[in-house]
Amino acid sequence: MEFKLLLVLCFNIGLICSQKTKPIGSKPIAVTTAAKTPATSTSPVTNGTGGPKFDLAALQKLLATFQMMQGAQGGNTAPSSSLPGVSSMPMPSANQISRKSNINANSLYQPELMNTNVPYMGNSLQQSRFQNQFLGGQFAPNVNVYRTNNHISSFEQMRLTRSYNLDEEQKFKILEEHNKFRSDVVQKRGTGAMNVLRWSEKLAAQASLEVMNCSYVNQGRGASLASVYEKYTGSSLVSEFMSRWSDEKNRFSLGENCSIQQTCRYSQAVWANTKQVGCAVQYCGDMSFIACSYSPVGNTVNQIAFSPSRGGICSACTTPPNMPVRCNSDHLCEWY
């Protein structure tokens, strides 16, 4: 239903006037104005000649309503006003809202809390997207659940600058693929303490030492290596080497030595206690060498990558004293 509301401020007589037109196929919408109600917290305004007074607060309220109506009809920005106390109201459309919007003072993503301190059952919006992925259909009790965007933590850095031959898109792709691995483990194998991975530039610098000499030899710094033909670039480069690590999943056996099974790259990618990753690329002739370093490092002798749990999603996340347990919509622990 379309309608148009035109507000006119008649300064010469000091009244609030309204002009309206009929919505198509409907009755006219009644508009109430209060022309002579004394304004609160502001001095009464006259027309300068002792004429009738009008209520500035009422005008501001009506103008705000008009701006909201304009935004609902598809406008991205409501018209601004020259009146004191009435500012423009930006109304971004859905396709203008990106992963990097709504940042806080610390230049992090503004976390979007999906629920607080109740077992998560899903509302109509999330249910269709997430319910079939739930292990048992419920998060653990007393868990704060935050929404992720493309498997990126709600608390990830706002910007990831280009370094070590990786641009921002590739870095976010690396995080996305790693967290997909980890979320898949929670859903299919069951663990209540799988941390979400975030980017570390310090680890990226460490990883660069593994590939700087164009050598496919692990230097013992806890890095995972891969070599990819140079025809792969951009996000396809990341997808290619991550798919090779994913192939190790078919041979992975929880509790077995990863070096024997030749699954150490996948095992490290899903090591539950790991919190950060940083990667680097070195171009060497017709090959690209990639290394990723992790912290805390995984593949520890006599330890397993993750522990199955029946306590619910995020039931065993480690949390500082007196702080709430944080989880996300990918079923990964949001660490502090």
Swiss-Prot record:
Glycans are attached at residues 47, 213, 257. Residues 73-85 have a biased composition (Polar residues). Residues 175-292 form the SCP domain. It holds the Pfam family CAP. The lineage of its organism: Eukaryota, Metazoa, Spiralia, Lophotrochozoa, Mollusca. This is SCP domain-containing protein 1. InterPro entries: CAP_dom (IPR014044), CAP_sf (IPR035940), CRISP-related (IPR001283). Component of the acid-insoluble and acid-soluble organic matrix of calcified layers of the shell (at protein level). It is found in: Secreted. Keywords: Glycoprotein, Secreted, Signal. It comes from Lottia gigantea.
